[in-house]
């Protein structure tokens, strides 16, 4: 993911089938780079419990206009995201500033902190997740923790700094090693964090 300067502010850029789009969480659009009239409404994405799906039609470089109740045509590409806000935390914060200027007072900042693949995350026992210290929209569920070679950890996609989806890991099983953008990151390097994580792992086994 790159940061590209625009006339308004720097915004992250993602690619859909090779076409770059700005992620603008303030106005809730994906905006084609170089063609600002072509916009994808983020609310057109299907929201599920653990991810969002965007059905992308490369022939029009926009969201698929057909029914989502049936399997899509072969040319439609389905992209999974954890959160658009996590791509553009500055824009998401700007939107909340307009709606509720006091929103920051509800943010939890007195929690244990651990490092996950080079970034700092709060350990939120109440919500059972890790929440990135510098990006409150980037959260990782305790349920995503796996045990590999007797080590608790997470498969992290470095492009999003969140967990790799199962289909991404399935695609990697045919490779001799994980692709460069996916790493196994050990977790739990603090007593309080370790206790919360291990308790959740025991509950998941029941």
Predicted regions and their residues:
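Gram-negative host-targeted secretion-system effectors, predominantly Type III and Type IV
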Residues: 1-206
């Amino acid at each position: 993911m790159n940061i590209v300067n625009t006339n308004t502010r720097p915004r992250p850029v993602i690619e859909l089938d090779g076409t770059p789009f700005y992620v603008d969480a303030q106005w809730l659009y994906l905006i084609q780079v170089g063609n600002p009239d072509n916009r994808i409404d983020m609310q057109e994405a299907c929201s599920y419990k653990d991810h969002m799906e965007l059905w992308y039609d490369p022939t029009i470089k926009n969201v698929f206009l057909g029914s989502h109740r049936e399997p899509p045509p072969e040319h439609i590409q389905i992209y999974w995201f954890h959160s658009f806000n996590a791509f553009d935390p500055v824009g998401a914060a700007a939107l909340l500033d307009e709606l509720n200027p006091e929103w920051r007072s509800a943010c939890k900042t007195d929690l244990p902190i651990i490092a996950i693949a080079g970034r700092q995350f709060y350990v939120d026992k109440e919500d059972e997740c890790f929440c990135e210290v510098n990006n409150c929209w980037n959260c990782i569920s305790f349920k995503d923790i796996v045990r590999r070679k007797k080590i608790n950890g997470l498969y992290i996609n470095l492009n999003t700094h969140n967990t790799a989806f199962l289909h991404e890991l399935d695609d990697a099983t045919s490779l001799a090693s994980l692709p460069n953008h996916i790493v196994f990151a050990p977790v739990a390097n603090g007593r309080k964090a370790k206790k919360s994580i291990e308790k959740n792992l025991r509950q998941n086994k029941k």
